Amino acid sequence: YELPIDPSKYRRRGLAVNLTRLLYRCPSCGTQEGLKLVRPYSTNRVECSSCFSAWVIDATCRLASVDENGQDEGNWAPLPDYYSRILAMPLIPIRTELRIGMEQGEELYLISRPRFLFKQEQFPNLRVLAFGRAFLTSRRLIFRTRLGIPLAAPLAGIGALSVDPGDKLHFTHEGKLYRIPFRNESALKWFDTIRRLQQAARRGQKG
């Protein structure tokens, strides 16, 4: 859970620069991708664009909530505690007007911004397979382009999930390796949600 701290970077962008990669939901209201960096970045603060709760982070990766005057309230807690709070939040289905061939009883949880989808046909080459949006449902990881759906992977068949530096999500399906770079979006959000839905499916429950 430790964030890499590069002195040359945090002087320009503050200690909170990578915080939203891990805290992809507001710890207070649960809004997805709700936390935004507060300017100037030297304040080392993030604020929720939905409920306006704010936090400050220090060099030891501890956070404290911030009052309306921008002062910490003294309730410092380690970053892993906040991450655990997010993992304990229930998954909330969302809606879309885009047609992705959802089946009866299938629920949608995540939609990405436009992304590239890479596929490894032969080791070690990863090549661009498509450009479109990723959709995560209670049953499948779907990638939709303007021309169709090149990938509709059942969650039970997705394995080897990992997140690499640069917010790249890797996974395998039917013996092939795939990669989706999630620039300016938390890849960990996708990793955690896929894992939670897989675990819920094995238990016969919702996420």
Q: Predicted segment positions?
A:
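Weak global preference for isoleucine
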Residues: 5, 57, 86, 92-94, ...
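Phosphoinositide-binding peripheral membrane targeting modules
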Residues: 119-185
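Anionic N-terminal interaction surfaces
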Residues: 65-133
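A broad, low-specificity signal marking well-ordered, structured residues that form hydrophobic/aromatic
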Residues: 24, 46, 108, 134, ...
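Non-catalytic C-terminal accessory region of glycerolipid acyltransferases
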Residues: 1-90, 172-173, 177-207
